[in-house]
C-alpha cells in the first residue's frame, strides 16, 4: 500500500516537472526572434505569432522552413510543432521565408514589409547563384540595391570606395571579367546616380520587377524520372509545372500551366498528374524520395490555389489592404514631395547664404583695398605738400638771389671805370652777371612750374582721398544680408494636412488628390514602357562595353546557354517562353514528356 502511494506520488511529481513550454528561434532574412511556445501549439499558432510580430498580413506567400537530412521541409499548419521531424534541442530553429512567389510583384505585393522580405530573399538567391542572373542585369540590380540602402547618390558623401565592403555581384560575374573592384563600382555608381528620388520601397520594387523576369526566379527544381527512366528536372512555380533538361535550368522543354491541371497525387515515390481534359491520359513520374513527393505536392497545391485566386476578384481583406496601401503610398508620396520642397528651399537658402558670404568677403576685401588706397593717398598728399613747400622756398630764394644779382649788375654799371682793363674786366663781370641772372631766372621759372605741378598733384591726391572716403562710407552703410523670412511658406491649399494625435496618424484625402494620383499612375505606366525600352538599350550597351573584358574560359554552363539563347534572339520574358511552349495541345505535350 505504501509502495503504491509512493509510486503515485513519484508519477505525479514527474508529471508536474514536465515543461509546459519550449523555445523556438525564428530566423528571417534580416533578423532573429525567439518565442516561448506552448507544448500543444500547432504550426498555425507559431506562424500567426511570427506574422503578427512582423506586422505581416500577406501571409499566404510565406512559411516556416526547416531541414530534414539535407531535404527542405515546411511546417504544416494543422500539425503540432513538436510532432514534426525537427530537432528537440532548444531553441528549435525555423526559417521564415517566402514559399510561393507572385506572378507580378508590383500588382500582388501590397505591404511594404512583404516587398522588403521578398527583396532580401531574391537578392540573396541571386548573390548565392541559386538564381542565374546575366552580368549586365546583375550590375543594374546592384544599383537598385545600393539605392535602397543608401538613398540618393551624393558625390560629396558617396566617394570612391564606398562600396568596397558591399556584396553586390555574384562571384561568378566578378570572376568572368578582367575588371577591378573599382571598375565594377564605377559602373554600378553610374546607374545608381540615375535612380535619384526613389524611396527604399520603390527601389526594392524596381529590383523585384527586373528579377521576376529571370528564368530561374521563383522556380523550385526536383530531380525526377519519366516512364522510360530518363532523368529530368521538374520545375514548380507560380505559372505551372515545367520539365527541364538537367543540364539546362533556364529554358523548359515543356510546360503545363495550372489551369490545365485537374488533379495531382502521389503514391510512394510515384507522382500522378491528371490534366483538366479527361480525354488526355494522365502522366506520371518518379522522384527520389517520398519526402520530396510531399514537398512537391505542397508546392503544387499552394501555387495552384494562388494561380486561381489571382484570376478571381480580390477578397474583402485584400481589397482593404490594397486601399490602405494606396492611401499609404499617396501619403508617402506627398510627404516626399513636401520633404523635397523643404530640401530645395534649404538648398536655395544655403546657396543664398553662400552667395551673401561671398559678397561680404568681397566687400571686406574692397574695403581693405579702399583703406589701403586712402592711406597711400594721404601719404602721397603729405609728401607732395612737403615737396611743394620746399620748392616754393627754393623759388623764393632763387628770386632773392636774382634780385641781388640785378642790383650788383646795376651797381657795377654805375661805377665809373676809367681804364680799358678795368672796363674789359667790368664788361666780363657784367657778362657773367647777366649769364648768372639769366640762369637764375630760368631756374626760378622752372621751380615755379614745378610748384604749380605739385599743387595740381596735391589737388588730385586730395580728390582721390575724398573718393576713397566716399566709397568706404558706401561699403560701411550697405546692408550685408537681405531680410530673410524665418517662417517657411505654408503648403499649397491642395496638399492635405497631417494631424498626429498621440501615437495615431490622421490623414484626410480629397477627391482631387485621388484623381491626381490616378493620373500619375497612368503617366507612370507610359513612362515605364519608355524606360523599359531605354533600360534594354542600356543593358545591351553595358554588355557590349564589358564583352571585350570577358574571360571565355571562365564561362559556366548557364553562361553559355544564356549567350546562345540571346544570340538566337531568345524570348524577352518567362511568360513569353511559357506561352510559346503551351501552343501545342496538352495531349502532344504529355506524349512528348513520355518520350523524353
From Swiss-Prot:
Organism placement in taxonomy: Eukaryota, Metazoa, Chordata, Craniata, Vertebrata
Keywords per UniProt: Cell membrane, Cell projection, Cytoplasm, Cytoskeleton, Membrane, Nucleus, Phosphoprotein, Tumor suppressor, Ubl conjugation
Topology in membrane: Peripheral membrane protein
Name listed for the protein in its UniProt record: Merlin
Posttranslational modification: Phosphorylation of Ser-518 inhibits nuclear localization by disrupting the intramolecular association of the FERM domain with the C-terminal tail. The dephosphorylation of Ser-518 favors the interaction with NOP53.
Gene3D superfamilies (alphabetical): 1.20.5.450, 1.20.80.10, 6.10.360.10, Phosphatidylinositol 3-kinase Catalytic Subunit, Chain A, domain 1, Pleckstrin-homology domain (PH domain)/Phosphotyrosine-binding domain (PTB)
Compartments where located: Cell membrane; Cell projection; Cytoplasm, Cytoskeleton; Nucleus
Natural source organism: Mus musculus (Mouse)
SMART domains assigned: B41, FERM_C
Biological process (GO), any one: regulation of protein localization to nucleus
Amino acid at each position: 500500500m505504501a509502495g503504491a502511494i509512493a509510486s503515485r506520488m513519484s508519477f505525479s511529481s514527474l508529471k508536474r516537472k514536465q515543461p509546459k513550454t519550449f523555445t523556438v528561434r525564428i530566423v528571417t532574412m534580416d533578423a532573429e526572434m525567439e518565442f516561448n511556445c506552448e507544448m500543444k501549439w500547432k504550426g498555425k499558432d507559431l506562424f500567426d505569432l511570427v506574422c503578427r510580430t512582423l506586422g505581416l498580413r500577406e501571409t499566404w506567400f510565406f512559411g516556416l522552413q526547416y531541414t530534414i537530412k539535407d531535404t527542405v521541409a515546411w511546417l504544416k499548419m494543422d500539425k503540432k510543432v513538436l510532432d514534426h521531424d525537427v530537432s528537440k534541442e532548444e531553441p528549435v530553429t525555423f526559417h521564415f521565408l517566402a514559399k510561393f512567389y507572385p506572378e507580378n510583384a508590383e500588382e500582388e505585393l501590397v505591404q511594404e514589409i512583404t516587398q522588403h522580405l521578398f527583396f532580401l530573399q531574391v537578392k540573396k538567391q541571386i548573390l548565392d547563384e541559386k538564381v542565374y542572373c546575366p552580368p549586365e542585369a546583375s550590375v543594374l540590380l546592384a544599383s537598385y540595391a545600393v539605392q535602397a540602402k543608401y538613398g540618393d547618390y551624393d558625390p560629396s558623401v558617396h566617394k570612391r570606395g564606398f562600396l568596397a565592403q558591399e556584396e553586390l555581384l555574384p562571384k561568378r560575374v566578378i570572376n568572368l571579367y578582367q575588371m577591378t573592384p573599382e571598375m565594377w563600382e564605377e559602373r554600378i555608381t553610374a546607374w545608381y546616380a540615375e535612380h535619384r528620388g526613389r524611396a527604399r520601397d520603390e527601389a526594392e520594387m524596381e529590383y523585384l520587377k527586373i528579377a521576376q523576369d529571370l528564368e530561374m526566379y521563383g522556380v523550385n527544381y526536383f530531380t525526377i524520372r519519366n516512364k522510360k527512366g530518363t532523368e529530368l528536372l521538374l520545375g514548380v512555380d507560380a505559372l505551372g509545372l515545367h520539365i527541364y533538361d538537367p543540364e539546362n535550368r533556364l529554358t523548359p522543354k515543356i510546360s503545363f500551366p495550372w489551369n490545365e491541371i485537374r488533379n495531382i497525387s502521389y503514391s510512394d515515390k510515384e507522382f500522378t498528374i491528371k490534366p483538366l481534359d479527361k480525354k488526355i491520359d494522365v502522366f506520371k513520374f518518379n522522384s527520389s524520395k517520398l519526402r520530396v513527393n510531399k514537398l512537391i505536392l505542397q508546392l503544387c497545391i499552394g501555387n495552384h490555389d494562388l494561380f486561381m485566386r489571382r484570376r478571381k476578384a480580390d477578397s474583402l481583406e485584400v481589397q482593404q489592404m490594397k486601399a490602405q496601401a494606396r492611401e499609404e503610398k499617396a501619403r508617402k508620396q506627398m510627404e516626399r514631395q513636401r520633404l523635397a520642397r523643404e530640401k530645395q528651399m534649404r538648398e536655395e537658402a544655403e546657396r543664398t547664404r553662400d552667395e551673401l558670404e561671398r559678397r561680404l568677403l568681397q566687400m571686406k576685401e574692397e574695403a581693405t583695398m579702399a583703406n589701403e588706397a586712402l592711406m597711400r593717398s594721404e601719404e602721397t598728399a603729405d609728401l607732395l605738400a612737403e615737396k611743394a613747400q620746399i620748392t616754393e622756398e627754393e623759388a623764393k630764394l632763387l628770386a632773392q638771389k636774382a634780385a641781388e644779382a640785378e642790383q650788383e649788375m646795376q651797381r657795377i654799371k654805375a661805377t665809373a671805370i676809367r681804364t680799358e682793363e678795368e672796363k674789359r674786366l667790368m664788361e666780363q663781370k657784367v657778362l657773367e652777371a647777366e649769364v648768372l641772372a639769366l640762369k637764375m631766372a630760368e631756374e626760378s621759372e622752372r621751380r615755379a612750374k614745378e610748384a604749380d605741378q605739385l599743387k595740381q598733384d596735391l589737388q588730385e591726391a586730395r580728390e582721390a582721398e575724398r573718393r576713397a572716403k566716399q566709397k568706404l562710407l558706401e561699403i560701411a552703410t550697405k546692408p550685408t544680408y537681405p531680410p530673410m523670412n524665418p517662417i517657411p511658406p505654408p503648403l499649397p491649399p491642395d496638399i492635405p494636412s497631417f494631424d498626429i494625435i498621440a501615437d495615431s496618424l490622421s490623414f484626410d484625402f480629397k477627391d482631387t488628390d485621388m484623381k491626381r494620383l490616378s493620373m500619375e499612375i497612368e503617366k507612370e505606366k507610359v513612362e515605364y514602357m519608355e524606360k523599359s525600352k531605354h533600360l534594354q538599350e542600356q543593358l545591351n550597351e553595358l554588355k557590349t562595353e564589358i564583352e571585350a573584358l570577358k574571360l571565355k574560359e571562365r564561362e559556366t554552363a548557364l553562361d553559355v546557354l544564356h549567350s546562345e539563347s540571346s544570340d538566337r534572339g531568345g524570348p524577352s520574358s518567362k511568360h513569353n517562353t511559357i506561352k510559346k511552349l503551351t501552343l501545342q495541345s496538352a495531349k502532344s505535350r504529355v506524349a512528348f514528356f513520355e518520350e523524353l
